[in-house]
Amino acid sequence: MTDLHTDVERYLRYLSVERQLSPITLLNYQRQLEAIINFASENGLQNWQQCDAAMVRNFAVRSRRKGLGAASLALRLSALRSFFDWLVSQNELKANPAKGVSAPKTPRHLPKNIDVDDINRLLDIDINDPLAVRDRAMLEVMYGAGLRLSELVGLDIKHLDLESGEVWVMGKGSKERRLPIGRNALSWIEHWLDLRDLFGSEDDALFLSKLGKRISARNVQKRFAEWGIKQGLNNHVHPHKLRHSFATHMLESSGDLRGVQELLGHANLSTTQIYTHLDFQHLASVYDAAHPRAKRGK
């Protein structure tokens, strides 16, 4: 029966020699496992056979109390589970004591949406050259359809149905969806198509760079940020913020969570619930209008 340090050293050699992990990854494993060694030693453990699920849970609680974030704790527990799995494979343990212990879910931080007045100011750009027309069209489509950045740059001309005012989008997991894009976006797309051949006509992409190639995601991010500054917006403008604003404004206006889910291309409704938020004033007005106990004087 070996001691705490010896087993960890053997495991790190296994990761280095047999798994051929990088020095940085090995160092991360070492740091995570040193933390559990220290905790186990403080609690009087002399070998890993004395470790049980209760001790692992106490270790997780203590780590959180000492300020370790949820994501970092998840990584620490993952390293610990892998180590114990290896001990089981070496017949040093009968079962993995960390198997049923999980870290709290990492909170998802939502980007701030752009309010409607600022959206209108952003879209009211001075059209003085073909690239500005292209950018206006991209902004209109991004906000008008709530696209992901990858979906915007992946658009081809053939994906447009100008008669119906719709666009075919290839989303995550190669899932295709058909979306309305609105009159304003449609008008600016047509305006851009009149100028597009100035940059080239061989590429199938809807939006081209000044070199005549499909515009890159990085270029879109850069141009949107520049327009945000030019238009005097206080918040940094990036594509995801436009998608988030689309979702928020649609939900505030319609209250149709399932409809917004379909428009965004979310596989699960829970994603839409996290992704969108209603401001308190809107929620209060919905409550006052709909809840039986809120209808005062009736």
UniProtKB/Swiss-Prot annotation:
Q: Which InterPro entries match?
A: CB (IPR044068), DNA_brk_join_enz (IPR011010), Integrase-like_cat_sf (IPR013762), Integrase_catalytic (IPR002104), Integrase_recombinase_N (IPR010998), Integrase_SAM-like_N (IPR004107), Recomb_XerC (IPR011931), Tyrosine_recombinase_XerC/XerD (IPR023009)
- Which range is the signal sequence, renumbered to this chain? none
Q: Which GO terms describe its biological process?
A: cell division; chromosome segregation; DNA transposition
Can you give the residue ranges of the Tyr recombinase domain?
109-288
Q: Name one GO molecular function term.
A: tyrosine-based site-specific recombinase activity
**What positions does UniProt annotate as the active site of this protein?**
148, 172, 240, 243, 266, 275
Name all Core-binding (CB) domain ranges: 2-88
Query: Which compartments does it reside in?
Result: Cytoplasm
Q: Which UniProt keywords apply?
A: Cell cycle, Cell division, Chromosome partition, Cytoplasm, DNA integration, DNA recombination, DNA-binding
Query: What is the regulatory mechanism acting on its activity?
Result: FtsK may regulate the catalytic switch between XerC and XerD in the heterotetrameric complex during the two steps of the recombination process.
Q: Which GO terms describe its cellular component?
A: cytoplasm
**Subunit structure, as described in the record:** Forms a cyclic heterotetrameric complex composed of two molecules of XerC and two molecules of XerD, in which XerC interacts with XerD via its C-terminal region, XerD interacts with XerC via its C-terminal region and so on.
Under PANTHER family, the record lists: PHAGE INTEGRASE-RELATED, TYROSINE RECOMBINASE XERC
Q: Which family is this protein grouped under?
A: Belongs to the 'phage' integrase family. XerC subfamily.
Q: Which NCBIfam families match?
A: PRK00283.1, recomb_XerC
Free-text function comment from the UniProt entry: Site-specific tyrosine recombinase, which acts by catalyzing the cutting and rejoining of the recombining DNA molecules. Binds cooperatively to specific DNA consensus sequences that are separated from XerD binding sites by a short central region, forming the heterotetrameric XerC-XerD complex that recombines DNA substrates. The complex is essential to convert dimers of the bacterial chromosome into monomers to permit their segregation at cell division. It also contributes to the segregational stability of plasmids. In the complex XerC specifically exchanges the top DNA strands.
Q: What is this protein called?
A: Tyrosine recombinase XerC
This chain's source organism reads Escherichia coli O157:H7
Highest lineage ranks of the organism?
Bacteria, Pseudomonadati, Pseudomonadota, Gammaproteobacteria, Enterobacterales
Gene this protein is translated from = xerC
